[in-house]
Curated annotation (Swiss-Prot):
Region (Disordered): 1-128, 813-888
Membrane topology: Multi-pass membrane protein
Protein name: Transmembrane channel-like protein 2
InterPro entries: TMC (IPR038900), TMC_dom (IPR012496)
Organism whose genome encodes this protein: Mus musculus
Any GO CC annotation of this UniProt entry: stereocilium
Keyword Transmembrane helix belongs to the record: yes
A GO molecular function held by the record: mechanosensitive monoatomic ion channel activity
Amino acid sequence: MSPQLKSLDEEGDKSARRPTRKQTSRAACPQDGHRAQSSRKDPAKGSPRPGSSRKKQMEHGSYHKGLQGQKPRKVERSLQGRKKDRRTSLKEQRASPKKEREALRKEAGKQLRKPRSTSLGSSVSTGDSLSEEELAQILEQVEEKKKLITTVRNKPWPMAKKLRELREAQAFVEKYEGALGKGKGKHLYAYRMMMAKKWVKFKRDFDNFKTQCIPWEMKIKDIESHFGSSVASYFIFLRWMYGVNLVLFGLIFGLVIIPEVLMGMPYGSIPRKTVPRAEEERAMDFSVLWDFEGYIKYSALFYGYYNNQRTIGWLRYRLPMAYFMVGVSVFGYSLMIVIRSMASNTQGSTSEGDSDSFTFSFKMFTSWDYLIGNSETADNKYVSITTSFKESIVDEQESNKEGNIHLTRFLRVLANFLILCCLCGSGYLIYFVVKRSQEFSKMQNVSWYERNEVEIVMSLLGMFCPPLFETIAALENYHPRTGLKWQLGRIFALFLGNLYTFLLALMDDVHLKLSNEEKIKNITHWTLFNYYNSSGGNESVPRPPPHPADVPRGSCWETAVGIEFMRLTVSDMLVTYLTILVGDFLRACFVRFMNHCWCWDLEAGFPSYAEFDISGNVLGLIFNQGMIWMGSFYAPGLVGINVLRLLTSMYFQCWAVMSSNVPHERVFKASRSNNFYMGLLLLVLFLSLLPVAYTVMSLPPSFDCGPFSGKNRMYDVLHETIENDFPKFLGKIFAFLANPGLIIPAILLMFLAIYYLNSVSKSLSRANAQLRKKIQALREVEKNHKSIKGKAIVTYSEDTIKNSSKNATQIHLTKEEPTSHSSSQIQTLDKKAQGPHTSSTEGGASPSTSWHHVGSQPPRGRRDSGQPQSQTYTGRSPSGKRTQRPHN
């Protein structure tokens, strides 16, 4: 054999003899190197079962004979080291497959990702043209990364992994998105991408800007956190009303007042724009101006100031037509915005679904906003969550409450009867006061109270009747939300009854003034005729026209109606502010500073702090808006005054509610949709339209004031414009459309369409309710399945724990069994282990057990391991030599 082959054989023998890690761990003891090799060569053939008597005999025999001549301490150390090595080897064997799999998975992922990134990076860096397949691959990867960026928030990953994946995806998109523009359209693609990013950023900034521009948002949120959503709903409604009135003010101010002031005839040029001679002395007195007389009466705030010229100024602006169309637009825009708001609220309330399930769980685990970084905001959020819990508790208590239904019905009937008596009495009182004021208007010297008796009585009724209604409503025992609706309806009936009583009495005054205007009209014509035709014989120059202040004029009933609505608005505003100042602020100051020196607890007893009157304030706002809609046609400046009133009311009432009021004793949640307020407002809008439509269509305008003077009816300006400014065929079309034979069928068709849509809406709502019940039933079934499954898992885990505890007890008892046997037992084991050729005396002790002491135990295999461990026992062969036999 050549030397090279010998060297290869030697290397092979060395490599074959080189022990593995597993073999070295088993051969850790000084004397078991040969045993490890024999254990590998001789597998377990007919090895005894664990726990059998044969195995115990072999363990004891090998243990005693193999350790003769060694000290017990060395044996124990070797046994402990052997056990530790075997345990570590088993752990490595178990953990190695998992580690190998993870390593393979990571390497595969790197190999899959590495070629793409390197190829893309090289192609992008070198600037080479990409093929269509590569472009498609890049586009696909970029789209996937973009999709991951948009959906990473919904992934069920830990936050660290989300951030890592998000950064990697953003870096990938920024790096390789430009590779798509390497062809002809590189600059165009880069420009489009830049503009798209800038547009997204602009929309985001604009949305943030719109959110910041919402007026009084933080004030309302602060109020909601302390007083609940029911009080905040009033301020949201007030803000909405302010926006509507701001639009109406823009229409009237921009299309009526400004054109008349800039292009119309100046003040003092005609009688309707001049203060009469008899009123000039006291025209600037405060008492006169407070009553909207003097110079205010003959200003652009009222109907009578505007001229009846068909066109004014160099623009030939048609002011009468603009005045009429703006009046129609006020009602049209208000009707459209109210119905649109109601529709949006209805859609929002139906899209929410059934949120009554798990109310407290949802509030507990999903109420907090983790983006809050301000301590004050956190305090407000804490108070808001507490208030929402109180609202839900009240709803839960009211849904489970039971009582005597017969007593409740009797008390509710009694309460409604008392409130009906109050409504009838207030209506009669207002009618009586208006009739009395007509008598006072004929007198010369009247007091301030007699001049303003109507406004004072109506304001006092609006101030004292709502608390009286609230006291009577305590008998009905309604849910707070239902009680609020009843209270709103009753106060609405009070205000509406008072308003229509006032209008009926005012219409009597209007008819009286119309009859007087005919006389004044004749007197004016004869006066001017005599003035111009009575000239002396020696006069050669004609007389100049009379001064506008000296011309007789009529009563101008439109301006009188506008003045009455202006007085009502201002007096209602002042009474509201005085009520807040005296009834809330001064009351709160008295309770706070006099409580420590009073006979009883002022905070807990009488008078205590005031609660915010939601129903009274809401109905006052709606009632005031109804007066604005009716009076704006006769007083264009009334909308501007109402805008100032709403603006000051927002700040004044926000300050009052935060400084002087306390939350309601029973805090309740407002309705999901604000449609109850909107429904009342829509009804007021319709009822406000009726008097204005009656005056426009039926009553003749004043002959010497206003843009419609000289016409039989106010709507004649529409016919005049159509005849003079439009082609004739359009006039025929408008005349055909105004035919009652066409209008009545159109109205009937509208009613049929409304009925059909209402029936469809009800059927859809019923289907929605049925689907909601089915979803609830499926949820209950799923919950029951989960509970049954959870119980089964708990039962199985308990059984497993019991079985494992029993096994552990058995193992513990086996380990703690004594190893000191009687001499006869040890001798019997030694005989069986040594074979038939070894003799021993009966009753004598074996020489190998001379060192055996209590507490020592023979080596055993691990009972908890999954694989059988090889152990070596020492015995004697039939020839008498010591041999080693593996036992698996």
